[in-house]
């Protein structure tokens, strides 16, 4: 079994190191994070689950770990635990989450968008991040936003779930569509997104 090391909070995403791979994800409101390692993009369950210790693997808003022996091409995802409050934080630990800083994505052949919402597990049909060498990644083809992380807000939503309900404030003919999301822009701006 590979050694589990403390890792570093920066850079975010996955980074190949001399000993293996460092993983780091921002999850400031989480009280627990698991790193899931998969053997293939179609794997219905992870080969390994690494439970990140809050004392060892958390620095401020960042959860991080270095796993010895891993290499480029490794597939991974996260489970994030925390409060589930109506109108507040929506942690759903049954969901495998894609790293927002992943440089590669696999799993499209098994991905089921409808399983991304609700409380049911999506482990067998989730997208997975791919560990890619930073120096091989074409940053010019995928430029970073020109604002600081302190000013960055990542707001994940499902178009249908966000706009389909009758109390969403979206016109019936636009519910469940990208046009419905346009109707919700003032709400998102009020949140600071």
Show where each model-derived region lies.
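Conserved, mostly hydrophobic/aromatic
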Residues: 25, 78, 157, 188
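Catalytic domains of carbohydrate-active enzymes, especially glycoside hydrolases
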Residues: 183-193
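Beta-strand signatures of extracellular beta-sandwich domains
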Residues: 34-36
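The feature marks proteins involved in alpha-glucan
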Residues: 1-18, 47-49, 57-62, 69-156, ...
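Short proline/glycine-enriched turn/loop motifs at strand-loop junctions of beta-rich domains
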Residues: 26-32
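Short S/T/G- and acidic-enriched coil/turn segments that sit immediately N-terminal to beta-strands
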Residues: 61-64, 181
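Structural beta-strand segments of beta-rich domains
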Residues: 19-23
């Amino acid at each position: 079994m590979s050694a589990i090391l403390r890792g570093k909070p920066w850079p975010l995403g996955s980074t190949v190191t001399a000993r293996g791979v460092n993983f780091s994800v921002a999850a400031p409101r989480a009280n627990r994070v698991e790193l899931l390692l998969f053997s293939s993009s179609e794997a219905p369950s992870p080969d390994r689950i690494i439970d990140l210790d809050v004392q060892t693997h958390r620095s401020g808003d960042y959860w991080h770990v270095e796993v010895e022996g891993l290499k480029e091409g490794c597939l991974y995802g996260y489970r994030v635990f925390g409060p589930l409050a109506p109108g507040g934080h929506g942690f759903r630990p049954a969901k495998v989450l894609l790293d927002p800083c992943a440089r590669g994505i696999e799993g499209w052949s098994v991905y089921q968008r409808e399983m991304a919402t609700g409380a049911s597990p999506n482990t067998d049909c989730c997208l997975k991040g791919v560990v890619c060498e930073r120096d091989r990644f074409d940053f010019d083809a995928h430029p970073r936003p020109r604002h600081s992380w302190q000013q960055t807000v990542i707001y994940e939503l499902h178009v249908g779930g966000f706009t389909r309900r009758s109390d969403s404030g979206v016109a019936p003919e636009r519910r469940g569509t990208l046009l419905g999301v346009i109707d919700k822009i003032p709400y998102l701006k009020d949140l600071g997104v």
